[in-house]
């Protein structure tokens, strides 16, 4: 059985698909391995896909030492659209089609994010305040005062741009929100 194969301590990388939470992945590994000693190194949004490092058994003890490096994210954004969740899956709250921006202007705007920045975590995030996740407050229609935090953006590059949408790659510190 698979549970016998998982009676080990270690770290595995799982390519988390869209529409699955990081905890869903942990639950699947727990069932497959027959152990509760499973964790993950950082949360990926449910609609994000990518590598999610999973610790099994005693490997969980090294999480604090491994989860400090720079993380790299690749994504896309649409200009002129604002949603209540700050991502494409939220309800549109504002649109603007009357804008003109070229690649040079976009590169300059992105450049301002490089280095150490102050960032207010979004309401639709797993950050806990008062023992409750911010997205739980948001789903109840409540807002919570969230203090800004320092984040470090090592690299922020535009990969492609068509005048309205662009692809980007960002290398950033743990705890940075990319929306």
Where are these regions (language model features)?
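Catalytic/RNA-binding core of pseudouridine synthases
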Residues: 2-179
């Amino acid at each position: 059985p698979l549970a016998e194969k998982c009676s080990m301590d270690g770290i595995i990388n799982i390519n988390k698909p869209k529409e699955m939470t990081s905890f869903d992945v942990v639950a699947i590994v727990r069932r497959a391995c027959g152990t509760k000693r499973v964790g993950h190194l950082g949360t990926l949004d449910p609609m994000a896909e990518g590598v999610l490092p999973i610790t099994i058994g005693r490997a969980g003890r090294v999480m604090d030492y491994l989860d400090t490096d720079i993380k790299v994210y690749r994504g896309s954004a649409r200009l002129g659209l604002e949603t209540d969740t700050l991502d494409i899956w939220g309800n549109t709250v504002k649109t603007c089609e009357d804008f003109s921006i070229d690649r040079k202007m976009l590169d300059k705007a992105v450049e301002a994010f490089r280095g150490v920045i102050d960032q207010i975590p979004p309401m639709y995030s797993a950050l806990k305040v008062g023992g409750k996740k911010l997205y739980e407050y948001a789903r109840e229609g409540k807002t919570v005062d969230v203090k800004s935090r320092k984040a470090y953006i090592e690299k922020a590059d535009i990969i492609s741009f068509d005048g309205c949408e662009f692809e980007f790659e960002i290398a950033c510190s743990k705890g940075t929100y990319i929306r």
